[in-house]
Amino acid sequence: TDLLAALGETKVSHDPLNLAAVAPDASHYLLTPGVLVRTGSTSDVAAAMAAAKRHNVAVNFRSGGTSLSGQGLTNGVMVDTRRSFRGIEVLDGGRKVRVQPGATIVAVNSVLARYGRKLGPDPASSVACTLGGVLADNSSGMSCGTVANSYRTLDSMIFVLASGTVIDTADPQCEDKLAHDEPELVETLMALRDQCREQARADEITFQFSRKNTMGYGLNAFLDYDTPAQILSHLMIGSEGTLGFISSAVMNTVKIMPNLATALLHFPTLDAATKALPALVKSGVTVTELMDSSSLQLCRDDPVNGHIIPPAPGSGDAALLVEYHCPDRKSRNEAVAAGNSVTSELDLVNKPTFTDDPAVRGPIWTLRSGLYAKVAGTRQSGQTALLEDIA
């Protein structure tokens, strides 16, 4: 009743068919929401969250193409952002972009392409995944690593807390507003900040987040930022919707590197492949994608592109798909020289060739991008694939 009064009948649905349609996601879980809200208004979301809090009902947000372990499910109030909240606004000549949570990676990058820019995060499901999920999961992808992920490229954010409080971190008065509206939250954030900055804890947090890590909350925010609103906005990244709703975000973009050098490095064992990583990283490689023997065999079985995967020298082989992204031909030539120097010292099945030919590198990336579907497709009828990021 509160939701209907606040939002109106056109935005709130109790229809069993609508609720059943959004009940499943790509996980093995099934929860049917009690109410479905579809709106493109931050104030509507704030009203919905405040009403849910008054009635002690859970609220969840549905985006697309993100985590696959039931994060998009609820038996309470579901707010579906995929039909609305799709705004994209280019700022500062493409160096920044304001995005809403219903916009997909592909849609944003297609707008940024004319400026020679793109978003830092590049998850494989970029056609379907929306910025709401990318930010809430701290998605990275194949080339951004820890340097250009969602956390590192966030400039500012508008978020809605469970109480209905709306904070815009681009507003110079945001710290005062947060302190006025949420004094207990601010006190808690400051206490946690001080605890995290104790030497032993700070050293552990620094170590954990010096590598790719999306487990739990981003506690590095307590070390990287000093004020409550900035800390909270960066805790939102990777929080999977548990801290609030991300209504929009301004993201710093990265330059598109037009000169590429790609190679598939084939190793006799998985151990040999992993031992090669430090030298490759030191050489400045942008992308390193590992494929084990099972993955390689599935790729070999592909009727279109399987021929590009070399035959297995025995059981347990592995491969690294590596790629250098460079701003010009000179730096590309230098990268290829560095790559050849490293690979000449590696335990490889055959000598690799670095290429920028789309006819060669395209099929390799097609196989890699479609690898999850191939692996999941081998399961028996009635089985469900369970997967989640563990790093």
Where are these regions (language model features)?
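Generic non-transmembrane alpha-helical segments
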Residues: D2-T10, A47, A51-H55, V111, ...
